[in-house]
Amino acid sequence: RHPFLSFMVWPLSLLDGWLMDMTGLNLVQFIVAVPLLFFAFYSFIFIFRIFRDIIKIRRFEAMVLSAMLFSFAYVMIAAVVPDHFCVSMFLLVFALYISGLKMQNGTRLSIWQTVLLFFVTAGVTLSNGVKIFIYALFTNGKKFFRIKYLLLAVLLPSALIWVFARWEYRTFVLPKEKARHEARLKKSAETRQKLF
């Protein structure tokens, strides 16, 4: 479900290990807080710019609506809890802003732009990729359904990320799941032996 997320946070894990070796303290809360603060701040900035530059409402109204978005408990929690929701929110709001600018200027999302947005957002959570395709559909209109665009911007990236996600699951996740399952069976068998 999160094909590139572990690779995106891997440098933060290395930094935490390095700082732990140097200081003897686990500083993961502070290390994770920095990107979360960045993503939350720029989510606010881009949602404000969507209201202001694309929807063209007044500055005060844009500020109130942006603040209202961040007053919702789900958004507040996403901004402080170390999970992928704040990252997804930033990426989707950023992609929505880009799509809005393209629609406003009468231009289309090119194949490479769609693929780049798809890989970055779907790499965090696969369902985000579908949202990028919806953005591209509204931005490009009927041209979204051109064979070249469908093949190179939709089907090929979807197949590539699916193959990568399956490889990642079989390589990193499945062996750990099997080991946990075997350990559970072994412990269950030992418990049964003790009872009899």
Question: What does each of the following model-derived ranges do?
Answer:
Residues R1, A153-F196:
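Aromatic-rich transmembrane-lumenal/periplasmic boundary elements in polytopic membrane proteins
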Residues R1-N26:
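Short hydrophobic/aromatic helix or loop-helix immediately within or flanking a transmembrane segment
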Residues L19-Y42:
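Loop-to-helix entry region of an early transmembrane alpha helix in multi-pass inner-membrane enzymes
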Residues L25, Q29, A33, L65-F90:
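Aromatic- and kink-enriched transmembrane "portal" helix at the membrane-lumen/periplasm boundary
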Residues I47-S71:
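Transmembrane-helix signature of polytopic, membrane-embedded enzymes
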Residues R52-F60, M103-L109, T139-Y149:
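Membrane-interface helix-boundary motifs at transmembrane edges
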Residues V87-Q104:
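Specific aromatic-rich, kink-prone transmembrane helix
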Residues R108-N140, L152-S158:
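Membrane-interface alpha helices of multi-pass inner-membrane proteins
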